[in-house]
């Protein structure tokens, strides 16, 4: 009888435990850094650098119940040494557990994909010759 109770309890705990590791859900904020990549997330947008390229999301990054996010934005792949433009429409996708983030930027009007890159919350990005250069511009609501 004790074996049945123990087995039932074990199955119940396994069913309700998160065996995939901790998940993060909700708004993403703050500085996230990695090797030659970085993200600064605000309550209305996020600014991203991967190498000498950069862009901004059009909305706040918010992780779903599985820690995944997907946001539209604009991205410039001809930024260095002089920003030549244009800013391309892009999708910023990835996942996070609240400490480590995997991020991919996909330009939707070309075949260009940057990443995936791995970023750590609270870590300063190590950008080399192309530092994170600007806070996202205020949005006028017209695009």
Segments (PLM) and residue ranges:
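Sec-dependent N-terminal signal peptides
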Residues: 4-12
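C-terminal motif of bacterial Sec signal peptides marking the signal peptidase cleavage site
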Residues: 15-16
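Tryptophan-anchored aromatic micro-motifs
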Residues: 21-38, 71, 126, 131-140
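A short, compositionally biased
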Residues: 26, 41-44, 97-101
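Residues that act as N-cap/strand-start positions at coil-to-secondary-structure junctions
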Residues: 26, 33, 42, 55, ...
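Beta-strand secondary-structure signal
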Residues: 31, 47, 70-72, 93, ...
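N-terminal glycine/threonine-rich, aromatic-flanked beta-hairpin/loop signature
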Residues: 35-77
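Beta-sheet ligand-binding and adhesion/scaffold domains
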Residues: 75-143
């Amino acid at each position: 009888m004790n074996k049945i109770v123990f087995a039932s309890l074990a199955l119940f705990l396994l069913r309700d435990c998160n065996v995939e590791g901790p998940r993060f859900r909700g708004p993403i904020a703050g500085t996230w850094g990695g090797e030659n990549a970085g993200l600064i997330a605000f309550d209305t947008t996020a600014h991203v650098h991967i190498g000498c390229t950069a862009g901004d999301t059009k909305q706040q990054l918010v992780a779903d119940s599985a820690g995944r996010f997907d946001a539209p934005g604009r991205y410039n792949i001809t930024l260095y040494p002089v920003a030549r433009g244009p800013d391309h429409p892009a999708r910023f996708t990835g996942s996070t557990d609240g400490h480590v983030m995997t991020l991919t930027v996909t330009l939707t009007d070309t075949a260009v994909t940057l990443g995936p890159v791995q970023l750590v919350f609270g870590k300063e990005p190590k950008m080399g010759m192309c530092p994170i250069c600007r806070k996202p511009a205020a949005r006028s609501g017209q695009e």
